[in-house]
């Protein structure tokens, strides 16, 4: 059970919450702050003060005063009218993440909701009732209005949820769990939907998968080095310390550890003086992607604990301030950066695939075919990798450079952060498939070299891979092989976390 405080949530905790289904509870001190802040909102309503989002309309209607008797209707109308999401739903892990992050930000005690609302969000998390939230429709400022409205709907007993493996109406799940839908009161609708939790939840899942994929890329690249009898000198510690980037030094160190007892690597000048860049520059390129990942993780952990709704309430109600923390620009930039960093791992992987299958670049059978000419072997797998890499280049175009005004030009600059976050996740799926193709080719090359000559670690990794796909002894439908390896990489926890060379043994 992970305790939410509004201040301390980490990526490591989100891994447990999203991937392992761990439950959550609220810090009592934080809940006390929620209750105290709520008293301020109720006094504002009682006194008839004019405060945006509490006693006024929204967006362009911010100058429209709402009567006390209409305050509840205002919140309900807000949720229904803003539930304009379209397209396929976010993965369940993302909608679960949205619930967690929305609760966490409310626990900062500046949003003005009742403790009841926070508790309801936590009930949904712990009972694994996950909102069906369409992926498209958010501009990323005023936060993720459309996606979060679909989240808010289910608290009211409306909309759909994923529950026990099925997609059902929210009331089906609430009834089975013995829960009553809530009725929103002043400010609560706005507090639920005015924030960056959709782009951030998708960003967190994307980061978790990207981190795992980056580690896996080092295993796979190491096996390719063996298949091509790569020069190990290029990974010498002195070379990388001379550059000074810690991530580059770390990648080189991990690859040295993986290959330390390999009989398939060579020394400088033995077979050739230098390797091509796709082998020789693995630490420099992969290390640069790790720099991106480290940046993204830092920004996500800030946003996971950020108050991003509007207005915010401070100093016991002395200050009720309309600001712009809902603007998703920091996450939009981070997700666009993640797109570029991950796409580059696929770029260099595809070039290693080419070196594995091109007979002009190695002494292996052409396209790793068991019978060159009669059988095409891995020829078209390289085409598939090239296609995915090309698609990534389109997806990597920054979403954050775009902005379209909305709400009659009141919201005249937006982040498009949710588009960036969604595209980052698509790129990661493509990267994983490119790496799967490289792994299939690298395993085949290793067989031609003699698997008994592989390092202890890569040999173990090879045998795990061969449990997913057989050796290429005849042409077959390789699409299935690629998807099998990709699924294994996505779900295999022994290589999903930090690269421990002993974990593969």
From Swiss-Prot:
Similarity comment: Belongs to the PAL/histidase family.
Root EC class: lyase
Record gene name: hutH
Organism: Bacillus thuringiensis subsp. konkukian (strain 97-27)
Protein name from the UniProt record: Histidine ammonia-lyase
Post-translational modification: Contains an active site 4-methylidene-imidazol-5-one (MIO), which is formed autocatalytically by cyclization and dehydration of residues Ala-Ser-Gly.
PANTHER family for the chain: HISTIDINE AMMONIA-LYASE (PTHR10362)
Keywords: Cytoplasm, Histidine metabolism, Lyase
GO cellular component, one term: cytoplasm
Entry's Gene Ontology BP terms: L-histidine catabolic process to glutamate and formamide; L-histidine catabolic process to glutamate and formate
Domain of life: Bacteria
Catalytic reaction(s) noted: L-histidine = trans-urocanate + NH4(+)
Molecular function (Gene Ontology), one example: histidine ammonia-lyase activity
Pathway given in the UniProt record: Amino-acid degradation; L-histidine degradation into L-glutamate; N-formimidoyl-L-glutamate from L-histidine: step 1/3
EC number: 4.3.1.3
Residues modified to 2,3-didehydroalanine (Ser): 142
């Amino acid at each position: 059970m992970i305790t939410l405080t509004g201040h301390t949530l980490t990526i490591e905790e989100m891994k447990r919450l999203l991937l392992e289904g761990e439950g959550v509870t609220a810090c009592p001190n934080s809940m006390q702050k929620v209750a105290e802040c709520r008293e301020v909102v109720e006094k504002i309503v009682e006194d008839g003060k004019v405060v945006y989002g509490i006693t006024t309309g929204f967006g362009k209607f911010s100058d429209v005063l709402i009567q006390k008797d209409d305050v509840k209707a205002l919140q309900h109308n807000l949720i229904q009218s803003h539930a304009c999401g379209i397209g396929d739903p976010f993965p369940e892990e993302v909608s679960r993440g949205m619930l967690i992050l929305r609760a966490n930000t409310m626990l900062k005690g500046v949003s003005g909701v009742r403790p009841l609302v926070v508790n309801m969000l936590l009930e949904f998390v712990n009972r694994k009732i996950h909102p069906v939230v369409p992926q498209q429709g958010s501009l990323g400022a005023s936060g993720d209005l459309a996606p979060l409205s679909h989240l808010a709907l289910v608290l009211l007993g409306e909309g759909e949820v994923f529950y026990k493996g099925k997609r059902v109406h929210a009331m089906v799940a609430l009834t089975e769990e013995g829960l009553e839908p809530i009725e929103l009161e002043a400010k609560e609708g706005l507090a639920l939907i005015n924030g960056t939790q959709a782009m951030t939840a998708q960003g967190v899942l994307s980061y978790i998968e990207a981190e795992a994929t980056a580690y896996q890329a080092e295993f796979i690249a190491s096996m390719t080095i063996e298949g091509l009898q790569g020069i190990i000198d290029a990974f010498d510690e002195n070379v990388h310390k001379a550059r000074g980037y810690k991530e580059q030094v770390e990648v080189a160190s991990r690859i040295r550890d993986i290959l330390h007892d390999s009989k398939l690597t060579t020394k400088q000048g033995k077979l050739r003086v230098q390797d091509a860049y796709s082998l020789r520059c693995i630490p420099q390129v992969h290390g640069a992607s790790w720099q991106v990942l480290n940046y993204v993780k830092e920004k996500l952990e800030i946003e996971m604990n950020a108050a991003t709704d509007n207005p915010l309430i401070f100093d016991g109600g002395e200050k009720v301030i309309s600001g712009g923390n809902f603007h998703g620009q920091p996450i939009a930039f981070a997700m666009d950066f993640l797109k570029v960093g991950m796409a580059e791992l696929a770029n260099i992987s595809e070039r290693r695939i080419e070196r594995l299958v091109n007979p002009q670049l190695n002494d292996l059978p052409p396209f790793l075919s068991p019978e060159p000419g009669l059988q095409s072997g891995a020829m078209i797998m390289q085409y598939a990798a090239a296609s995915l890499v090309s698609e990534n280049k389109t997806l990597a175009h920054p979403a954050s450079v775009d902005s379209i005004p909305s709400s009659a030009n009141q919201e005249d600059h937006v982040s498009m952060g949710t588009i960036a976050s969604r595209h980052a996740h698509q790129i990661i799926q493509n990267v994983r498939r490119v790496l799967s193709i490289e792994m299939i080719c690298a395993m085949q090359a290793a067989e031609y070299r003699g698997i008994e000559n592989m390092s202890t670690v890569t040999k173990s990794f090879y045998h795990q891979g061969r449990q997913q796909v057989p050796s290429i002894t005849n042409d077959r439908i390789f699409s299935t092989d690629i998807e099998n390896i990709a699924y294994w990489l996505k779900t295999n926890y022994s290589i999903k976390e930090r690269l421990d060379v002993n974990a593969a043994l």
